[in-house]
């Protein structure tokens, strides 16, 4: 062991841990310096998360929460109390994990980071509202301001002062004119023409008119101030607080209002307040879409599911021969419009398609219906149309099942009223420096940041906005510093990847400016390109410099080298881990012989660059043309089959859109018959070389404690068959079901096969206590009497994969699957370990193992999204071996990855970029790693050059 003896100090600069035994920790003692950047590293499963999250964070949070009242505690999720003798020097803890943010469609990047709240405040305090129709600013002027505005015109300009009295109203207005004459007025302007009051022509009764009373006619001179003031006062009195000054020679009009309103149409707003700009408040949200920005509609492309078929044979589900009532309507339409119900839908004239889908309008059609009794009856009415029919049924039904069914024909589109802005009309026409809020929110963060940095307001507006602007620009700056410059504030939070969501939380934490806190982060570098790594590390150091302890579980080499202190866990994983190998500075860790991390840091061990690359076979290519989802710019992707291809590029360059949203969904639809809707593309060639596609992601293998590696990989069934075949089982008549803990029979009924009983504690975390009847064994006594090679079913579930591999050596169906779990480096997990306790990286490798154990055709396309998440250098070497085996059988592997060790070993690279967001979405480079390293504009190439030397 390398030196890591805890000092016996009682200073305030150390977090002292004594006797930590959480999960697989082996009673460890450890001192960690406070207010430093500490990286916890080690193999996958070596106990990093157990130390950082389940011990340090859990205890820090628990102590803080316990200081609250019992009433407040019941609303907080309490962590389990870690199994540890003593922890001293803890601060209140905040964890920033990789869970995706909320699944609430109302959450956006702006609301999650609270920038939107500051923007609402800014627009409410210094925004200028405009009239949506006349595009004039709403403003109120005093009489003296109106006079000054007229006096600013060139001297001797002839001006007519008018009072706008009638706007867009029908009528003859005879009495109105008589009334004006009685009040002593001489002239009026009717529909733009000026008349003497006694010469006004007779007005058309059914046409809308505009009438202004002429109050005064003046030439602009300095000495007419008093006269103008009196004229304006009269005009305001008669013109409903509005007045109009018209230059008589040019006809140009200057509108004035004494009320806060549009001088032309009197459109006015109550006082601007922040909630007018909130799409989550009825006062601000667009009434059509309720502030969601999009509406559901019945999509003709989904309604006509099979355009190649005829209406009679099922072009439109539910309207073909099998549905007599609806099909009779179609036949009557065919008679009326003269088309053939047996003709393919795509060959029908556009007019016919329009009538069938959207109805006949006012045109009446003769319908003939045949009742079930065989009687014929006729009806004449307009045809509703299939889409209006679906809309009506969707509105009127009370059945959730019918709604679910109808939803299959729906799609989203931007809301027709607000165009996706989410806000009501009034809020969309309030401007700051000429820009409305929804436009600013749709820009990439770099542009938004620049706009507010250079925003120049005048007078007291500047003073009001100063503090708000400081908050906005700072927070935007933090988001840009964690590599999220390509996002925009209106981006929905549910579309963010785990890494993006985590970095947004990180930026929000810096924005909150807390000090004296212990932050625990889980691999913040996930999904980040090497280029943005330095900015992320600078952000972490900034958190530390505010006076916080920053503890990061991380495998990234740069992060380990930049840390103030490194804790290396190991030596193995699971049972073989849980010890601290060394806790010291990065330099000393690199010197440590026993530490695998140290060996990789010092260069004693490394992942080798392959000596030769597998050549590309031009006859076996998968070509995807014209991909244009999200920010992709009409991309054509060429994938050589039978090789390992890495898709690289900075965050937000379009990798996930191209692979997960386009390629994976097209191939799943064509090869696996999945109901997937890919992002827009033109064409795909080369699918004949493949027979299935498998997307191996990091989602959990099961969400309940009953799901475990044995059930997921299908190991458990042959194991139960072995137990059912034991002579004693046969004698008692036990079958395979007897050995399942999910059904009655063999399981312990007291805990229903869970092995633990949940006790609700209300103010404290729920406690799981071992079942008193079976003592956590999950089965009843009779079942446990059955033994195979001296072990019962519960003891088998408690074995690690490694132990089970030896135990079942003679049973090929079982040992083959166990061997693949060993191959992906999961020898340490227990067969019955609850799926909920597996990390994302472990879950992904269980899936890989399952794929490896299947019989193989060698024509599979595997898609992996950042498989190195949660993996140490040594684990990556193992993963590359497994992927190499898949390739060896002739399969094709596509990996989205930022890790240079994986990228340098690929046969082919497709690099997207050059930037994220709008600045990305193009293929910058493609070819072998050596070829990509030579491409000037490629960031990936720049970093590859260094590792390929």
Curated annotation (Swiss-Prot):
The UvrABC repair system catalyzes the recognition and processing of DNA lesions. UvrA is an ATPase and a DNA-binding protein. A damage recognition complex composed of 2 UvrA and 2 UvrB subunits scans DNA for abnormalities. When the presence of a lesion has been verified by UvrB, the UvrA molecules dissociate. This is UvrABC system protein A. One of its GO terms (molecular function) is ATP hydrolysis activity. It comes from Neisseria meningitidis serogroup B (strain ATCC BAA-335 / MC58). Residues 319-596, 616-945 form the ABC transporter domain. It is found in: Cytoplasm. Forms a heterotetramer with UvrB during the search for lesions. A zinc finger (C4-type) spans 262-289, 748-774. Belongs to the ABC transporter superfamily. UvrA family. InterPro entries: ABC_transporter-like_ATP-bd, ABC_transporter-like_CS, ATP_grasp_subdomain_1, P-loop_NTPase, UvrA, UvrA_DNA-bd, UvrA_inter. PROSITE patterns: ABC_TRANSPORTER_1, ABC_TRANSPORTER_2. The gene is uvrA. ATP binds at residues 42-49, 649-656. GO terms for cellular component: cytoplasm; excinuclease repair complex. NCBIfam families: PRK00349.1, uvra. Keywords: ATP-binding, Cytoplasm, DNA damage, DNA excision, DNA repair, DNA-binding, Excision nuclease, Metal-binding, Nucleotide-binding, Repeat, SOS response, Zinc, Zinc-finger. GO terms for biological process: nucleotide-excision repair; SOS response.
